[in-house]
């Protein structure tokens, strides 16, 4: 086969082991997954009710425009419906963005380490990837990213809060950054974890009307607890949305996914409860880190913590796994002596912390 040259050296995404597989290998009767930043509280009771009662005509294609969901989300953010695009998770939106803006003559700027799909999709398109190392505290080096932009740059990625460090860039700094980015360079502000930020930032969706080169990406996979439904969305100027719709598959979000997302976004009381629970979980890890001088906890603003214990990441990962907790080794994330741990329920956090204390 005459494969694209840009695929040479690239690997496919390797999902972690299934919980059942880990239990069988290690002889465990219970395993707690804290590796994929899923919501430990599940999803809204209203979503659960819909799942129990809903019937979907599986022989009928879904609404390709996601009309009902579009209306609800537009109303929630006080946006125009044409300022939204819905995709099969943010992963698909990232793919669409790289498809319309990158090729072998272009480059893209991003932090490192950050969400790996930016780099992966850019390389698939044959583009040059310009990675700017994070600052010592895990924050984006925004000045360094600005300096990396040239006439061939078409996309700049800003993951906020950043995955895997958890650092959050406040709105004033985002606006100052946007003021300096050339108007023909798209800034992707990936806010997959924005609902977890405490206190919640000022509403800023309408920045897209000031900055015509901005797209804000969000998801129903994290705090809304709909990871398996695969519903993400972008907020941008109508001209950007129009270009993305040219390459968007016609029926890319499912009927059930659209229905579940509608119920999920309506239940903001559940979202507030999740945010409070998550903030309390972060406090548990902060208290743990303060007790041990050798432990470095990166600023946590998502639903996960990145903890550097000064011990080889694989050792920490294996130790926790053998004791019934699946986490994410920092070795694959650019942090060789750290692990990323999803914030769980209070008792789960306490159990992991107790194990880490024994390891130290």
Curated annotation (Swiss-Prot):
Catalytic activity: L-histidinol phosphate + 2-oxoglutarate = 3-(imidazol-4-yl)-2-oxopropyl phosphate + L-glutamate
Gene Ontology molecular functions: histidinol-phosphate transaminase activity; pyridoxal phosphate binding
Modified residues (N6-(pyridoxal phosphate)lysine): 222
Pfam families noted in UniProt: Aminotran_1_2 (PF00155)
Involved pathway(s): Amino-acid biosynthesis; L-histidine biosynthesis; L-histidine from 5-phospho-alpha-D-ribose 1-diphosphate: step 7/9
Top-level lineage group: Bacteria
Transmembrane portions of the chain: none
Entries under CDD domains matching the protein: AAT_like
Cofactor(s) in the UniProt record: pyridoxal 5'-phosphate
UniProtKB keywords: Amino-acid biosynthesis, Aminotransferase, Histidine biosynthesis, Pyridoxal phosphate, Transferase
EC number: 2.6.1.9
Subunit record text: Homodimer.
Stated family: Belongs to the class-II pyridoxal-phosphate-dependent aminotransferase family. Histidinol-phosphate aminotransferase subfamily.
NCBIfam families with a match to the protein in the record: hisC
PANTHER family listed in its UniProt record: HISTIDINOL-PHOSPHATE AMINOTRANSFERASE, HISTIDINOL-PHOSPHATE AMINOTRANSFERASE 2
Designated name of the protein: Histidinol-phosphate aminotransferase
Organism of derivation: Listeria monocytogenes serotype 4b (strain CLIP80459)
């Amino acid at each position: 086969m005459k494969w694209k040259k840009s695929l040479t050296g690239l690997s496919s995404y390797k999902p972690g082991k299934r919980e059942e597989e880990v239990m069988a290998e290690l002889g465990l009767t219970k395993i707690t997954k804290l590796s994929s930043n899923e919501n430990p509280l599940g999803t809204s009771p209203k979503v659960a009710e819909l799942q129990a009662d809903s019937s979907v005509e599986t022989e009928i294609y879904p609404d390709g425009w996601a009309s009902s969901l579009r209306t609800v989300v537009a109303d929630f953010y006080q946006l125009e419906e044409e300022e939204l695009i819905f995709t099969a998770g943010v992963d698909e939106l990232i793919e669409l963005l790289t498809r319309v803006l990158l090729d072998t003559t272009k480059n893209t700027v991003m932090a490192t380490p950050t969400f790996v799909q930016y780099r992966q999709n850019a390389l698939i398109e044959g583009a040059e990837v310009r990675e700017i190392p994070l600052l010592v505290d895990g924050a984006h080096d925004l000045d360094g990213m600005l300096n990396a932009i040239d006439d061939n740059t078409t996309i700049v990625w800003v993951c906020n809060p950043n995955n895997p460090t958890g650092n959050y860039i406040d709105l004033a700094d985002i606006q100052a950054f946007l003021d300096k980015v050339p108007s023909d360079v798209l800034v992707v502000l990936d806010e997959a974890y924005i609902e977890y930020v405490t206190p919640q930032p000022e509403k800023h969706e309408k920045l897209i009307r000031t900055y015509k080169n901005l797209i804000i990406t969000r998801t129903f996979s994290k705090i809304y607890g709909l990871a398996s439904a695969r519903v993400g969305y972008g907020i941008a100027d109508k001209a950007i949305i129009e270009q993305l719709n040219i390459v968007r598959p016609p029926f890319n979000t499912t009927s059930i996914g659209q229905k579940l997302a509608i119920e999920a976004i309506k239940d903001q009381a559940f979202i507030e409860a999740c945010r409070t629970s998550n903030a309390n979980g972060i406090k548990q890890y902060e208290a743990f880190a303060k007790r041990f001088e050798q432990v470095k906890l990166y600023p946590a603003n998502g639903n996960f913590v990145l903890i550097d214990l000064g011990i080889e990441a694989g050792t920490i990962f294996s130790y926790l796994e053998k004791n019934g907790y699946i986490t994410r080794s920092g070795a694959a994330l650019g942090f060789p002596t750290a692990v990323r741990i999803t914030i769980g329920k209070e008792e789960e956090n306490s159990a992991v912390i107790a194990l880490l204390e024994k390891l130290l």
